[in-house]
A protein has these predicted regions:
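A short, conserved alpha-helix in the catalytic core of glycosyltransferases
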Residues: 1, 126-130, 184-209, 213-244
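C-terminal, non-catalytic tails of nucleotide-sugar-dependent glycosyltransferases
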Residues: 1-27, 150-151, 162-189, 235, ...
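Cell-envelope/extracellular polymer assembly enzymes that use nucleotide-activated donors
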Residues: 25-30, 57, 223
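A conserved hydrophobic helix/loop-capping motif in glycosyltransferases and polysaccharide synthases
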Residues: 28-39, 43, 50-51, 61-63, ...
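Acidic donor-binding segment of Leloir-type glycosyltransferases
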Residues: 48-92
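Glycine-rich, basic loop-to-helix element that forms the pyrophosphate-binding segment
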Residues: 89-107
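Short aromatic/hydrophobic "clamp" motif used to bind/position activated sugar donors
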Residues: 112
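Conserved donor NDP-sugar-binding/catalytic core segment of glycosyltransferases
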Residues: 119-165
Length: 294
């Protein structure tokens, strides 16, 4: 009774299940941004010109931009792309969960796509692919395969416990690598995926209490995924949804004393909240493999 097509991959013994879209619901794309309009424009143009799924709205969440050209761009892009809407997060500092939660408040879609402003869609059916997985009744959230600018792997799922908290799997692997047991290229369940590109059912997002604003920068997406799993839903990694991710351009890196202190407090918060999960180990990662590096 499942509408799907099963095809074999070139590698012997591996298959792909391609689910048919049940319908074409509205997808709300939530894009936090601060200046760096070149990156934002590249992201939006890929949504408009590369992506083929059309029932979408773009909620651009402006947070503390400083350049006049940024606001001129907002005026222009909302005229050029009617489905784009700029909303203003007016608090001080940076709080990724708060920014995204506000974006959701200003959206209407049945499905939410959290998308970094420094991403760019690679394959035309990227959004359709994410949606086809997210429409499955047992699935709560779906993540994509992300590449660095040089084409190497930036994200192919998240491993709980890596580095003491959580880390991306297969970072730095070559673009066409299969990975351990072909995990880079196969659709599968994970404990978490990155919110640099993550689709979530709206009702599930609300059911689990949204993003926890206590994680201003780090681990908010992992925390959300674990709450979704705790509620009984699956987290799916879909390598057939591909994007480039020009990581951390608009926010910067953890390179000041204040940022390091904030990061350490978020590590502590995560380790206390998910102590049992960390002790038991990630059910989607072999206990025989190291957590010291990916």
């Amino acid at each position: 009774g499942i509408s799907a097509e099963v095809t074999s991959r070139a590698e012997k013994g591996f298959y792909r299940v391609k689910y048919e879209l049940q319908d074409k619901p509205l997808v709300s794309v939530i894009i936090p941004t601060k200046d760096h309009i070149e990156d934002l424009d590249k992201c939006l143009q890929s949504l408009e010109k590369v992506n083929t799924y059309d029932n979408m709205e773009y909620i651009i969440v402006e947070n503390n931009s400083e350049k006049e050209e940024t606001f001129e761009y907002y005026d222009r892009i909302q005229k050029e792309i009617p489905k784009a809407k700029v909303v203003y997060w007016k608090e001080q500092g940076f709080n990724y969960p708060s920014i995204n939660n506000m974006g959701v408040d200003n959206s209407k879609g049945e499905y939410l796509l959290f998308l970094n402003n420094d991403t760019e869609i690679v394959n035309p059916d990227c959004i359709s692919e994410l949606l086809s997985q997210c429409q499955r009744s047992e699935v709560g959230a779906v993540g994509a395969r992300l590449y660095y600018e040089d084409g190497t792997i930036q994200h192919a799922g998240v491993i709980i416990g890596m580095g003491g908290v959580a880390g991306h799997a297969f970072v730095g692997f070559e673009h066409d690598d299969l990975g351990y047991f072909a995990r880079i290229v196969l659709v599968q369940d994970y404990s978490a995926v990155t919110a640099a590109c993550m689709m979530v059912k709206r009702n599930v997002f609300e059911e689990v209490g949204r993003f926890d604003e206590g994680y201003a920068v780090a681990f908010n997406d992992v925390d959300l995924c674990l709450k979704i799993r705790e509620a009984g839903y699956l987290i799916v990694y879909d390598p057939y949804a591909e994007l480039n991710h020009y990581e951390s351009k608009s926010r910067g890196y953890e390179d000041t004393e204040e940022k390091v202190a904030r990061f350490n407090s978020e590590v502590d918060r995560f380790q206390k909240r998910w102590k049992d999960v960390l002790q038991k180990g990630d059910p989607f990662y072999s206990p025989n493999l190291t957590l010291d590096k990916n």
